[in-house]
Amino acid sequence: MSLHKVSDTSLTSPSTSESKQAKLYVVKEAKGLPELKEKKSMVNHLKPLPPLQNDYRIPEEVLLSLNYAANAGPCPESLLPVKKPKAPKCALPRLVDHVWQHPIRRDKFKYLIDHPVSLTGAGRDISFLYDVKYVKGEAVEKKLCPPNKSTQSQSSAMVPHKEKTLADTLVPEEFHIVSNTGVSGLECYDDKYTTLLTDSENRLLLFPSMKPNKRVEVVQLSNVMDTMLERAGIENENYVGPTKMHQLLNVLKREQSIYNTVFHELIRQVSVDCADRGELLSKIREKYVQMLDHIAQQMIEFYKDLVTQRMMDQRILQELYNFKNVIEELTRELCLVQAHDRKLTKEAEKVQKNLAEALLEAEKNAKIVEDYHDLYTMQRGRMESDIKLLMTERDIWSSATYELALKVIERNRVILAKKLYLSEKGWNKYAKHFIIMLSTKDTGDLGMVEKLTEKWKKLVNKFKQDVERTEESTKEKSEIVKAGIIKWQEFFNNNLGKDVIIPSKRSPFAVALNDFKEYEKMLEEEKEKFTGDFLLSRYDALKVIKRLQENWTDIGFGILSRHKSMDGLLPPEHEYMEDIVKIISKLYREYEIRINGDNGISKVLPNLVISLDMCVFKLENFLDYSQVPTEEWLEIDEKINEMKFHLEALLNIIDSVPEGMDMEPGAALLEHICEMIQQWLLKLGNEITNGQIELLRHMDEMHIAMIQWMVNLLTIMLPDFTDQDILPKREESSLETPEEHEIGIAELEINAIALVKRLARYSSYLHSCCIGMVRAMALSRAAHLQKNPAKDRQDLERMNRECYDWISTCSHLISDIKGRKIRLLSYEEAEKLLGEEEASKLYFDPEKPPIDDDTDDEIDFKKPKFQEKEAPLPAAAEAEAIEATEAAGAATAEATGAAETATAEATGPATAEAAGAAGAATAEATEAAGAATAEATGAAGAKVTTEQGPSPSTNEKTIRYIKKDENIHCKPLFEEGIFFSWREPPSQGVMEPKYLEIMNVIEHMQRKLTEMDTRARKAEERFDEVNEQLHHSLIRNRNLERELEELVKTTMMGSQVKTENAKENQEDRGGKDDDEHQQTQTPPTSAKKEAQPTNSSEAPEDQNTPEPKPN
């Protein structure tokens, strides 16, 4: 088949007949094909060529074969045309050759349509070997879309491809290979009037032209191929890929595309002339493609190995780089370690050197220490021997001093010094005992407070958690109710006036009713938590907490009350404790408000329950409706809005208190309280320790001061004494002058006043600290039935009594030295120390006249004590005084013993009068003895000084008595001539009024003593008479009792005998014997009744008329 020549006009415009046929074909195809839009060239080498000469123009068939794939449009779902087709530029659609209309003949040229030209470059080249693009130096995966999409017109009729990306896998990115879509063969199908050709994307294509070709077309095709190869080479020179392989593949791709296009056209041209040659060329082409595929597979494997090796090299290089960095870092650290090691080595050498020097020094010092130790041991032995010698000398001198002191005390009659020492020793012992007891009690109470506070904290935390749990439950349920009612409100508002259907095919009103009932039940349960038994249990728990808190606060206040200052002020911890109690009361108030709902919960919850109840009632009426009633729903909607407001208020007031109350949140307040309690316990422990130390320090100071004052007193009281026969006479300048003696006495008095004030104040303070503790201990011991429960309280009173005795003794000593009465302690201080009753009894003793009223003492005080020397009492006077004292004591004891004997024996019906008489006799005897003793003491009160006075005669009667200084003094028993024997008459001196007053008192006392003696003798006589009467009455009673017992025994014996006789004769005598038996029983009973009045009548006679005493 030869190719027909085509004129120049035929290349641009078809002939007249062909144009008519083309128009008819366009009209036919207008209904089945969409309008083809103009498209730009898909590849750079398909751009329009520059204008050539007429001999070198591209034939029409070549242009159509090159452009039909690019200008192919999508295949519609229906063959109906949507738009009028538009003829492509530079060529008109041509009619399908007849050879393609017959299936048998079409099969011979099937190889022309099995391998269509692909614009994607897939299936005919090796472009799939590199599908990873490099954009700005970074690898980007190539998307599955046609190449050069950016150059494609946005108005193209081609079907757009959906962009796809690879999913993330475990395979590294550098191993991802993405291939282009392959190209499948074209398919033909017969239409009613023509045959259509489609590709794999359902695009309509033109059949290859079977028009005979000419040699010119072959030459032109060759020129076009050369031009395209030349242009492809120029473009490849401008292309720069990431690697040489990419550049090679780009060249192969472009050249293969050109070869594929030209080869396809050659096969078509050959097939026109000879179908067999075309088929052979097609087979050769297939083999060529298979060969390229085989090469491609080999290149793929090579590429994989290459990429793998490159990645391995890259990883190895990275590891080498990292290894190099690690080596550098390790080398750097090694250098630092070596430098540090060198430094340490130098320091170690230096330390070793210093250590060696220190060892040498230590050895030297050890030798020196050994020498010193030996020296110390020797010196200690000598010192111990010296100390033993000194202690022995001290003991000897102490015993000698003690014996001398006793002799001096007996000689100078300073018995009060011994009493002063014993009082001080007793006071010191009791004070130390109570200080230790106070410290022990405080320590035990502090431990108890710590335990109780810990227990209180645990209970409060547990109570707080319960309250918070309840409030959290109320809050959660309130939120559930709020969300539920809002949900139903929105549901019914959206379906107002409509038929309401829910997926469960149940009535929405029934579901809403169940929900509202559930809401009502939930709120009802929450309301019960603020009333009834639940609230009472909460109050009970809070009461337990309050009681526990009151226990440890009471113990704390008790500890602080025992640690007042000397001025009676409480420690600052007491005020701190009061602040804690106030804050705790605020905490209790807050919890009370929260558990009983006074913050508003107790008002809101009932309103919510009532509103829900009304809604439930309304919803029950909705069950018969299929639509939401408008009027009834408006009422429910109004109630729901009201409930929403109440629920919002409820959520805001939970876990809060009213705004009017100034309170902190419960958790913060409790934490603050715990911190305050911890600080208070620390302060309380410090206060107890410091208080004990202060008490012991003050006691030691008082002890030393009292001992020092007693030593100073003895030094001043003992006068200077020299003996001409034994000791040389001291110089006058070394003797103590009267002025120095008076100054010493004044200093002693001043020190005594200050010391007494301190001692009384300290004793009162210690007594006030311990009295509450001692009382509590006494009550506890009494409750446990222990022996002597009030022993500690008695010891505490003894401590104050010892203190007062010391002060009183000190007052007597100072008064004796000063020559006038001196009171070191006022009545108010004594009352504070001993109490009102005891102070009145001791301060104003009615039995002993005050020192101011003692005439003889006043006479003695007018002269200095160191110039007075009392003459020794004669032995006869001492004996008489002792006998008088013993006689008075014996008389008193005899009278008292007789009275007690009479009282003990006065028992029975006849002892009342005798007991009364005995009591009167006892009283009279005691009064007489007391008067006699008082007279003797009063008579002894007039002490006569021994200053150069005449000694009493041996025949004169004297009496011994104990004066206030506890020394034994003697004075004449009868003092009528006491002033006339050796002193001037009282009428001539200033003592006359005093003397007359004393004499009147003595005469009055003598008369009173005589009267008391008479009454005592009468009482003794009467006592004897009453005793005899009592004795006879007792004997008479015993006789009568004995007679009565004998009479009862005889009566009982007779009744038993007669009873036995009656039993034996009962059958014969019958009822008559019973009467006789009753008559025989009557005499003993009547005799017994007669005996009783006789005894009763005789008893008064015995009581009133005493019988003579039997001999």
Swiss-Prot record:
Disruption phenotype annotation: Mutant mice are viable and show no abnormalities. However, Axdnd1-deficient males are sterile with reduced testis size caused by increased germ cell apoptosis. Testicular late spermatids are deformed with abnormal manchette structure, thereby causing male infertility.
Top-level taxon in the UniProt lineage: Eukaryota
Comp. bias regions, Basic and acidic residues: 1060-1078
Tissue note: Highly expressed in testes. Mainly expressed in the round and late spermatids. Expression is detected also in the brain, lungs, spleen, and intestine.
Taxonomy of the source species: Eukaryota, Metazoa, Chordata, Craniata, Vertebrata
Localization terms from the record: Cytoplasm
Region named Disordered: 887-919, 1050-1111
GO cellular component: ciliary basal body; cytoplasm; cytosol
Coiled coil ranges: 314-368
Polar residues: compositionally biased ranges: 1092-1111
Function text: Essential for spermiogenesis and male fertility probably by regulating the manchette dynamics, spermatid head shaping and sperm flagellum assembly.
Protein name: Axonemal dynein light chain domain-containing protein 1
Gene Ontology biological process terms from the UniProt entry: manchette assembly; spermatogenesis
Swiss-Prot/TrEMBL keywords: Coiled coil, Cytoplasm, Differentiation, Spermatogenesis
